[in-house]
Amino acid sequence: MKYKGAYKLFDAARVRTYPLRVRPSKVQVADFLDVAALRRAEIRCPTEPWFRDGRPGGGPDQSAGLQELAGHIVDCHRAGKPVVVLTGAHPIKNGQIPIVIVLIRRGVVTLYSTNVAGAIHSFEFALTGASSESVRDALPTGEFGMAFETGAYLNCAVEIGWAAGIGLGEAMGRLYCDAEFRKKVIDRALADRADTGEYFKPYEGFPFADACVFAAAYRKGIPVCVHASVGTDITDQHDSFNGAAKGATSGADFLVFAEEMCRFTEGGVVLNVGTAIMGPEVLLKAVSMAANTGRAPNGLVTGDFDVRPFVFDDDRRDESQAYYYLRDQKSVATRIPKVFGGVGYYFQGLHEATLPPLYQYVMRGLGVA
């Protein structure tokens, strides 16, 4: 689009970037959870509260609730019912994503959703084995989010995916797993660069792709849906950013997600992990679309994982209270499963504490020690 509006636009061509290799990163792939060792380890459950259908669960820890939820996941897998996982970027950045990768490879997870920040961290980990810059250190000099490869390669992948008529998540999968697609992305990103010697050029593949959830899902043939906003991601800061491409490809992903929700007519599980707004809102709209077309998610089971105490009170419904606006507690853990005759769980705590025992219970339920 050629802008013809009344206001002055920022000229993104003036933005200065730097090679990703010179930027320090705070987290390494080597720090990721060792799921093989976890399977053999003793199960340790958090002692923070857990809730079922908005009511406190019992026991000295979360073991009863996590076992119940794991049982639902195992039962759905064996019955061929969908199991969907939505996360923010932090489960990727804090090293818990190997849990999702294993469940994808085993055919348990049937669709994975995240935001563009999740795609960004996945890209940097797959390319360099490290991610997560220091915002505090980089912001004063205007270097925050300005690593060239992160912006250019991801933006070009989205733009080429747009031209190919595929979704944003599928474009990311092809970047890691399709050599021809990857070459197009790298060539386009570097086309106007006079000196490319300092840039990573992964023509032969991404060295750490095995730690990438997008690659795992693409190889398994299941969707990854990326639910994007404009102006929320470091890729939007770059001259290579194409808002039309980002919107169109993410829009396609949303329709893929909505279609997956139509498979829940006889039940299924949705896990919402660390996404307080994106996940709940995407789920709410998709569920409404499914119900509108005669394919309501009957008996839906949800699991919501976050650090905040559970304070939502669906009986009072007091819009003057702050708890009313905690969308994950309201929609994911309470209202959506209640409306469709299902069960909603909420587990308070850091993902590093709540996700490993859930994974252990699932794997043992599958008979994998």
Describe the residue ranges of each PLM region.
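Glycine-rich phosphate/diphosphate-binding loops that line cofactor/substrate pockets in enzymes
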Residues: Q67-V83, A216-K220, E259-E266, L366-A369
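Short acidic, glycine/serine/threonine-rich loops at helix termini
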Residues: G95-I99, S122-S131, D236-S240, V282-K285, ...
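Short gly/pro/ser/thr-enriched loop/turn and capping motifs at secondary-structure boundaries
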Residues: A117-S122, T232-T235, P309-V311
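Ligand-binding beta-strand-loop-alpha-helix segment within the catalytic cores
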Residues: H121, E133-K220, C225-V226
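Conserved mixed alpha/beta catalytic, RNA-binding, or beta-rich assembly cores of soluble enzyme
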Residues: V226-R263, G267-V269, E281-L284
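C-terminal functional extensions of proteins
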Residues: V256-E260, E266-V269, A276-A369
